[in-house]
C-alpha cells in the first residue's frame, strides 16, 4: 500500500459520501501518510492488534484488510466502527473508548505470552481524557506490550487543543516536538495538518 493509494482511497470515500452513497458520518485522513506508514513498518501485520478511533481507514488498509471489504463496511455505514476481528483490527467511535480496550487486549497478550503487541491510535484531545490517562498509566506500571500512537492535528473538532488546556507541549511528552515521531515507553507521538477534509464528512454535505 503506497502513500498515493491511501490518498486515492480516501478520495473515493469522499466522492461516495458527497454523492449520497454513504449515509452515515465519515472521518477522513489527509496529511499524515508518511508518519502512519513509518509506524506500520514496526507492526507485525499478522500477529499484532491495531485499535483505532472513528478515523481509521488508513490503519485498516495498512493492516492488510482487503479494500473491497473495507469499502463495503463504509458504504454500509460502519466507517466509524470498522471491526475486523479476523484481522485483529478494532475501532470505537466513543471518545476515550478505545484505550482501555486496547490495554485489556495487551494485558491478555502478556498473560498468554503470545508475543503479540497492541498498537492503539488516539487523537490529541482524546489523549487528554481520563480514560486515556488511566489506560496509559496501567500499561506502564504493568509493562504491557502496547504502543499508544497519538496523532496531533492541534484540534478537537474545531477547538485548538492548546487553547483548551493552556499549554503547547502535552503532559505525556518528555520533550518538545521537532517534526519527527517522538518515541517514548509505550507511546508514539506526531503532528500533522489535514487541510483537505473537515473534521467530519467531505466538505459538501451537512451531517449532524
Residue ranges and their predicted role:
Residues 14, 21-142, 163-167:
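Cofactor-binding active-site loop characterized by glycine-rich and histidine/acidic residues
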Residues 13-15, 38, 174-179:
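Intrinsically disordered, low-complexity boundary segments flanking structured domains
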Residues 142-208:
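Thiamine diphosphate
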Residues 2-3, 17, 113-116, 148-151:
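A short alpha-helix capping/helix-coil boundary motif
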Residues 1-23, 72-86, 194-196, 200-208:
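Conserved internal helical-beta-strand scaffold that buttresses enzyme catalytic cores
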